[in-house]
Amino acid sequence: MKILWLSSWFGDYRVPVYDNLNRLSDGAFWIVCSEMETSELVRRKLREKLGDHAIIMPQQKIIRLGNADSDFANSSLALHWQQGLYSAIRNVKPDVIIVEGFGRWAPAGIIYSILHRKRLLMFYERTAWTERKAGWWRTLYRRLAGKAVDCFLSNGAFSEQYLRENLGFSSAPIIRGCMSADSFYLHYDVEAELEARHKADREAECRNGKGIRFLYVGRIVEPKGIRQLLEAWEIHHRSYPDDTLTLAGEGILLNEMRERYGDDKGIIMAGYVSYDRIYSYYKDCDVVVQPTLEDNWSLVIPEAMSCGRAVMCSIYNGGYPELVKDSVNGYSFDPLDKEGFVNAFAKFHSANLLKMGRQGMMIEKNFSPEKAALRIYKACCPVV
């Protein structure tokens, strides 16, 4: 059984899933991706794991319509044309095709599956909240194109709810838990650096006047809730002046936020941090905060959990129902409710951070690359 996954863009976190799918299929897994939309680091890792089964397509043409400057979902329309894509699919002669959502390269996979009567799986991440501005024509297209899909692979409850209630696939097979973070390697890197240091020292630091170390990892842009984060932090810091907040990431708001906040009020603007070094930031924090205003399934939360860190997660992150259990491994909050946001920061001062971290590690294990790959592989198997 040959499995072919079409995905023009993805990050490092996907490579372990692809590697596990390749093992489960006894080497009968292929991935087609874009050279223009993936990093050199990702392409190198793919070649190491998959060899010539990693098909990397050269430059593609992208036409953007609408407000291309906005980072919010559905603010613009991007049309992707990749020369040779259909030929690449045809050369593999797959028994199963996996596409990413309805856009980008998905139409090529959908057409091939219909013409050649092959099993079609669709990896779908969006939620009703992220798609609240999708428009009638996007919704109509998705309802029509989705009729060709044999099984949907979703992040969790919110994605399944959107597929069933908003797009009308009420009886379609939908497999949850198909997203994962690169948890194994992050956990390994953090543990390697902490080996010579007793873990209990972290809690002692929080109780000896050094405060709690909060961390944000991600782009410094409007949809990530950066303005709301720093406004709430200003208020929180007046009551807890020993706490610190580190922002690891870059984006269009970075310079503006640096000018406004600098490094005062316990705020540290770290700027860009490579994926291969992000583990050191997880190692040196106590709580990871994700204040997003819209996100399908933020990978930062399971990454933090795999490293044994408590989490503070926005209710607009599509993954929070599965990943965040209030008072168990962290707290959820509404970033648009400033008072609630500030209160969420304060809750960690009466929490057992080490216990929360351990609970988070247990929850995250259900979303490991191995388990995600196994769920996906089982969805492929009905063709046998």
Residue ranges and their predicted role:
Residues 147-202, 209:
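Donor nucleotide-sugar binding/catalytic pocket of nucleotide-sugar-dependent glycosyltransferases
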Residues 316-327, 331-332:
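Short acidic/histidine- and often glycine-rich active-site loop of Leloir-type glycosyltransferases
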